[in-house]
Amino acid sequence: MLGSGQSRYRMVVAMASVMLAGVFWNGPASARIQGNCGDCHTMHNSQGGSPMTFDTDAAPNNNLLRGTCLGCHAQGGSSATVNLGTDNMPQVMHTGGVDLAGGNFAYITGLKGSGASDRKGHNIGPLTGTDAVLYAPPGGIVQFGHDDGLNVNTNNLSCAGTNGCHGYRYSSRGEGIGGSHHRNVDGQIANPTEPADSYRFLMGVKGYESGDWEETVSSSSHNEYFGLTAPVALGCSNATSCHTSDGAGVAPPDGTMSQFCATCHGNFHTVATDSSDGIGTDTMSPFIRHPTDLALPATGEYAQYTVYDPASPVARTGSVPAAPSGTVSPGSDAVMCLSCHVAHASNYSSMLRWDYSQMVAGGGQTATAGCFACHTTKD
């Protein structure tokens, strides 16, 4: 599995750092890419009789690009960011000691961490190889094409476009995210209308982007995520449909991170529908699946989680923060997908932020991480 995927990946990035030497990423205020157009684009994919693509492939790329997402953001180097003169470019595959907020695909291949495993993250074929066990996304909402892999599966999962996460999800990879780097915004994202002004190019997602992608992170310096105080019933044609009516394609109806994840893993997030049992029939415990987009209770064990922990982030409800806060407010701040998981990959099974096998109730560990960040009295 790792051989073909990694070899293609290494070939793509082998020349990327050389070719990108003149590209600049503007500062956090605008986050728009700057630099010589020819560092990213080629008019005819030909110069001096040779192809201009980063991997010297004779086949040209969409949007006149010299490479794909991997050539810029998955160089496999020793740092979570690559310096490009005036700023840094985030890396989703590297061997550095610090990972960015989205995690690190290197854990899947074994380039970093405790050993290769498909279970450690999303398997992007050209980068990590396809998943050897799963075909359809786990937790797909039970409706046509969503729970059986007909729409998105391990063979077609990509970074962007129809079968990916970033950009418009009705277009191929290139068109789905095309132009977004030139219009990218940073900081508070409260009214997303296109990928460029959506949180991390995730169409329709609201939030606050940390300018360094959490390369340096603390209780007072981090991303902020948007959520709801109570989850909703998701579907294809109701008021909380993931399919937009404004031509934007697939997007979370309320702009929350958990609803975005639910576009593939809907049965893990929705209140029960006619076809999916979801988290249960309502928003009150007991649940049959751990809820998301649900406010932490302001009483009992949950009331003790008051200092923001980047290892167990919460989502803010009501409005999108204009700046990061080091305070957690039980009763309004909500649990979400990323409270427990990372987006790309981690060193633990199921993309978890911690080793689930080490979460031992009543073990007297006085732990404050993992499950016990919220369930403060169960350690």
Where are these regions (language model features)?
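A motif-centric signal for short, conserved binding hotspots located
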Residues: 32-379
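C-terminal segment of classical bacterial N-terminal signal peptides
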Residues: 20-28
